[in-house]
Amino acid sequence: MKTRLVSITFVLFTSLVLVAQDQYTKGMTKAMSLWGEGKIIEASNLFERIALAEEDNWIPYYYVAQVNTTSSFGEKDVKKLTRQLDKAKEFVAIAQRISPDNPELLVQEAMINTAWMAFDGATYGPVLAGKNTQIYNKALKLAPENPRVVYSKASWDMGSARYFGKDTAPYCADVERALQLFATFESELPFYPSWGEEQAKKELEQCKG
């Protein structure tokens, strides 16, 4: 009888886990679809609801940050920009508490800083440029074979080199290496970040052009 009760409990627990996983997959897929359709607010809100239900999973928190960061590039309304980047910073900080020393989250943190500098380089560049260099160096030390880390650091270094009138050739080689890493990089985590390859290809074309 005891064995039977244990078996029933295990089956019920397994069923609940599978249902939860299925809900997570459906929710994340829907949020990704909304994002792809350009429905930024709806996508962000859905990622946020998923994140609050997945307290030990850094990935939905990451996407709240990423959606709000990427939509901030080119934004002219300072109030909207501040609202989006503050939310991005809040959620990437939570994700970093869940998954410390995560290179993907470090890259996302640097992207938030870059969005501020893209908005007002004179104001934010002196404050955030050095921080970004430190962040990318840390990310590369943690994950030298991660293509997003290699590409993002190379892109950052290339931009800095152009600004100071220095040779960008070494960083073009890093972009090429990133593309090689993209070809083989895999993760078993569902919805693990996968962006960067197309951006790296465009960056490499500029190097050769």
Predicted ranges, named:
Residues 83-90, 126-137, 147, 165-186:
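TPR/TPR-like (Sel1-like) alpha-helical repeat modules
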Residues 70-79, 110, 115-124, 159-165, ...:
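Short coil/turn linking the two alpha-helices of tandem helical-hairpin repeats
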Residues 169-209:
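Terminal, low-structured helical/coil segments at or just beyond the last alpha-helical repeat
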Residues 21-69, 76:
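Start-of-domain marker
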Residues 1-27:
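Bacterial Sec-dependent N-terminal signal peptides
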Residues 30, 64, 71, 109, ...:
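Structural register within alpha-helical repeat arrays
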